[in-house]
Amino acid sequence: MKKIIFSVIAVVAIAFATNINVQAQSAMSTSKNTKMVGGAAMYPTKDIVDNAVNSKDHTTLVAAVKAAGLVETLKSDGPFTVFAPTNKAFDKLPKGTVESLVMPENKATLTKILTYHVVVGKMDSKAIAAAIKKGKGKAELTTVEGGKLWAWMKGNKLVIKDEKGGMSTVTIADVNQSNGVIHVVNTVLLPK
């Protein structure tokens, strides 16, 4: 009888330990794919908008996306690659620019600027690196707005140049979303 009780306890203990191990592995794989942006976890199971609204570093971008009426577009299936400027990036613009852009009468200009930060398709850093290699050191990206961005490596940093000659550095790459990928940038990119 003691042998049977011991066997049952051993089986229960093994099953319990196996369950804990599976849960731990599942949590580790989720956390491995989840990046922190603006103090918030960016979950690859959520879309671009649902993640961005949680980043304290992207409140200006989120407000601009709402003002431009782009929420539904960026919640759609995509996939999209978004070069997401931080609040500090927007702060670099001349004083009053953001306040002016979010006014209803400037919606077309705001939409043009925001869609200039979006490329159709999911281009993670490996895909961008491959495009840079194929372009012999520089990749040309076509934006949803219809303009061009150029990407290259400067040391170990990915640099993006806009049509006006402005330069932005990717500060956090490969923030995977259910409908694409976000690369956090430190300067607002401006089309012609």
In which residue ranges do the predicted regions lie?
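C-terminal segment of classical bacterial N-terminal signal peptides
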Residues: 14-23
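Hydrophobic alpha-helical membrane-insertion segments
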Residues: 11-12, 95
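Mature, structured domains of secreted/extracytosolic soluble proteins
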Residues: 4-6, 22-192
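Bacterial N-terminal signal peptides that target proteins for export
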Residues: 1-9, 18
